């Protein structure tokens, strides 16, 4: 079974023609056509920033530098010249940015689009997860138990918090109570969204993929409940949990699959979930709401720019609407999931530890 890291690293464009094999600039694996040439995401972002900021780079070797993905500190001047040589068009960058409008109001400490920052932070999250969950190279996924799942998600609290700080400088600058409130409202929906996203990518209907790289075997839940600390029969317990997982599949995995959501759209959904949540911290509410409007607006512009770059959808506004329409399903599934947790706690039926239960409980 593919791991989340493997899936992200090998993620393919949803274009019917498929992405070109190699970036014409640095020979890295390409993820599509950008500004008129086959390119990887890094080279496309480099070209876009250079054009948008009118940067001028100097070459210390008179234009004789090697431009390869494994070369550290690639010469920017030679990299830019190679972008032009392989067919990238400056006019394509300016035209698309003009169509989307200016980014007035974004925090001045941002040097790149929000989605680019998020994707870098998410790639780092996948690397950190391997260490946090003691994942060895080429380690095969396995079915885990309820007790093991608790440990995974307790460790995930730190991993996801670090991801938010990396992805959003604005989040790092918030008051501690405000950060905690946003995090609590984000943790459960993001956990469900991410698990469903990888379930859709791997087309696995009888497993629930978890961040450690392992999974819950939904076809054999008796192995998931491997202790006797419950008041119901195992049959009743399995029935309740099976209903919970079916709800998750129907509410989130099916819509993600139906729309063939890509990694940029997945991250955009996660960002909007974070910045749409209500706050219990009244003192900071107005400032956060103003910042949230700016960030969500930037996310929408980034998505539209992404659609225009990959040139797959005839109507990008309709595509955007279809993706955003998944958000209510995620929130409903989160509320239902929390209701299940409350019932299990009341019945002392595989109840979560208090710190994990609190983190899975929204503040609003």
From Swiss-Prot:
Domain NR LBD intervals: 110-363
Keywords associated with the record: DNA-binding, Metal-binding, Nucleus, Receptor, Transcription, Transcription regulation, Zinc, Zinc-finger
GO biological process, any: regulation of transcription by RNA polymerase II
Annotation: DNA-binding region: 20-95
Molecular function, one GO term: zinc ion binding
Cellular compartment(s): Nucleus
Zinc finger motifs (NR C4-type), residue ranges: 23-43, 59-83
Coiled-coil intervals: none
InterPro entries, alphabetized: NHR-like_dom_sf, Nucl_hrmn_rcpt_lig-bd, Znf_hrmn_rcpt, Znf_NHR/GATA
Pfam families for this protein: Hormone_recep (PF00104), zf-C4 (PF00105)
CC annotations in GO: nucleus
Family, as annotated: Belongs to the nuclear hormone receptor family.
Cited function: Orphan nuclear receptor.
Protein name (database record): Nuclear hormone receptor family member nhr-53
């Amino acid at each position: 079974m593919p791991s989340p890291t493997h899936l992200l690293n090998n993620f393919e464009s949803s274009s019917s023609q498929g992405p070109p094999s190699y970036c014409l600039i640095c020979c890295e694996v390409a993820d599509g056509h950008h500004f008129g040439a086959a390119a990887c995401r890094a080279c496309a972002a480099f070209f876009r920033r250079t054009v948008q900021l009118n940067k001028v780079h100097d070459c210390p070797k008179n234009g004789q530098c090697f431009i390869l993905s494994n070369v550290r500190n690639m010469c920017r001047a030679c990299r830019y010249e190679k972008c032009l040589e392989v067919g990238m068009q400056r006019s394509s960058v300016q035209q698309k940015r003009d169509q989307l409008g200016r980014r007035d109001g974004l925090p001045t400490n941002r040097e790149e689009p929000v989605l680019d920052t998020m994707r870098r932070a998410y790639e780092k999250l996948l690397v950190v997860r391997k260490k946090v969950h003691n994942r060895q190279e080429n380690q095969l996924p396995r079915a885990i138990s309820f007790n093991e799942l608790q440990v995974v998600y307790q460790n995930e609290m730190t991993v996801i918090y670090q991801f938010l700080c990396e992805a959003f400088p604005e989040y790092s600058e918030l008051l501690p109570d405000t950060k905690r409130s946003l995090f609590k409202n984000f943790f459960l929906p993001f956990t469900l969204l991410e698990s469903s996203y990888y379930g859709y990518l791997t087309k696995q209907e009888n497993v629930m993929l978890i961040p450690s790289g392992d999974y819950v075997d939904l076809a054999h839940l008796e192995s998931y409940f491997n202790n006797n600390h419950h008041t119901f029969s195992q049959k009743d317990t399995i029935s309740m949990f099976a209903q919970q997982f079916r709800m998750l599949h129907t509410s989130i995995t099916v819509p993600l699959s139906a729309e063939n959501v890509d990694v940029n759209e997945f991250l955009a959904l996660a960002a909007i979930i974070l910045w749409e949540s209500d706050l219990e911290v009244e003192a900071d509410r107005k400032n956060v709401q103003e910042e949230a409007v700016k960030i969500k607006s930037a996310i929408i512009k980034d998505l539209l720019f992404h659609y225009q770059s990959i040139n797959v959808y005839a109507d990008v506004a309709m595509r955007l609407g279809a993706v955003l329409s998944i958000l209510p399903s995620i929130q409903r599934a989160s509320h239902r999931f929390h209701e299940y947790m409350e019932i299990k706690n009341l019945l002392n039926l595989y109840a979560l530890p208090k710190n994990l239960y609190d983190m899975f409980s929204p503040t609003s």
